[in-house]
Amino acid sequence: MFSAKDTLAKVDPELWQAIQAEVQRQEDHIELIASENYVSKAVMEAQGSQLTNKYAEGYPGKRYYGGCEYVDVAEQIAIDRLKKLFGAEAANVQPNSGSQANQAVLMAFAKPGDTIMGMSLAEGGHLTHGMALNMSGKWFNVVSYGLNEKEEIDYDKMEALAREHKPKIIVAGASAYALRIDWERFAKIAKEVGAIFWVDMAHYAGLIAAGFYPNPVPFADVVTSTTHKTLRGPRGGVILMKAEHEKALNSAIFPGLQGGPLEHVIAAKAVAFKEAATPEFKNYQEQVINNARVMARVLGEERGLRIVSGRTESHVFLLDLRAKNITGKDAEAALGRAHITVNKNGIPNDPQKPFVTSGIRIGSPAMTTRGFTEIEAEQIAHLVADVLEAPSDEAVAATVREKVSALCKKFPVYGA
């Protein structure tokens, strides 16, 4: 039998030390990666619960294993909360990731060799929307749409491509697009050409839940999302769908792609969905947008950096660093030395290789979870610009680290 005294620190001190070092890094660094966030203690408690012991192939009320009566309750709570949060007819909370949720859509509605249409990865899309090296690009004929000269989605060209190629599926959504997306226009185009309209709202889900970004659920046949990022839950995926597609999509997840679901993660998702329905979460998401706008304004208007698309209408934006003669890779490293975490990111039609890039992506979800407001957002933007103006200057990095340390101590991730 296991003893309650057999803690991780005692059983595996080597791993414990690595985890503690990561905990300290999260406390000591300002996190500006748009796809990262911090979860609540309640979410972590659910994910670390004894539900991890239970195998539960199938769905609530229709399991292939006995002893599922309580995980059925937990999973149904998650389903019901998710449907209510976004106004969906049906939902699946079992996908282990956003990518697996996306694979399920492709499995349910297309066959290898069929044509699908998605936003070009080079212009802000996601690799699961048709990148050549991804399953979606290997198995399907991919037609990509992109941006116009204003670096906004080129709806007119996308419409022309859809009429020409008549794809089985049209996917809207992005991993590096700062502006609002016109779901209704996508839906009209998809209907005209007879395509399934699929939205991947992974980056915007928290903003949508709080009412600060358009909700795609009324317009789309199916919506996928991650549960982390702006939604501030555990790492995982979900699918929202019209009732008529529930059987096909549920079958695509199980038995199509997965076996037993991760019921401990599903329980953590349920907690996050409850948190996302609170007034506090709405206030948080409003602050997320305000902080992103302040950082974009300071970096663009005051510090002379080019913001891709010229502005942000969400939690994220891209910085084009070509005028500074620094690559995204080097900028990421320089900011990391100053204890500011970002990710290198391609800009539209980037001439650099994907592991080098000409830009960085900046997001406000994690920093806002710490309690940062417009005041701190302005300070952070100036710190970022200071480093980018002298990326090899250790004295600048040291000064910025000191200021970052003061901010992090004032706003801990997990307070008392």
UniProtKB/Swiss-Prot annotation:
Pathway: One-carbon metabolism; tetrahydrofolate interconversion; Amino-acid biosynthesis; glycine biosynthesis; glycine from L-serine: step 1/1. Keywords: Amino-acid biosynthesis, Cytoplasm, One-carbon metabolism, Pyridoxal phosphate, Transferase. The modification N6-(pyridoxal phosphate)lysine is found at K229. Its EC number is 2.1.2.1. GO terms for cellular component: cytosol. It is found in: Cytoplasm. (6S)-5,6,7,8-tetrahydrofolate binds at L121, G125, H126, L127. GO terms for biological process: glycine biosynthetic process from serine; tetrahydrofolate interconversion. The keyword Iron does not apply. It catalyses: (6R)-5,10-methylene-5,6,7,8-tetrahydrofolate + glycine + H2O = (6S)-5,6,7,8-tetrahydrofolate + L-serine. GO terms for molecular function: glycine hydroxymethyltransferase activity; pyridoxal phosphate binding. SUPFAM superfamilies: PLP-dependent transferases. It is an enzyme of class 2 (transferase). It comes from the Bacteria. Catalyzes the reversible interconversion of serine and glycine with tetrahydrofolate (THF) serving as the one-carbon carrier. This reaction serves as the major source of one-carbon groups required for the biosynthesis of purines, thymidylate, methionine, and other important biomolecules. Also exhibits THF-independent aldolase activity toward beta-hydroxyamino acids, producing glycine and aldehydes, via a retro-aldol mechanism. Homodimer. Belongs to the SHMT family. PANTHER family: SERINE HYDROXYMETHYLTRANSFERASE. This is Serine hydroxymethyltransferase. It comes from Dechloromonas aromatica (strain RCB).
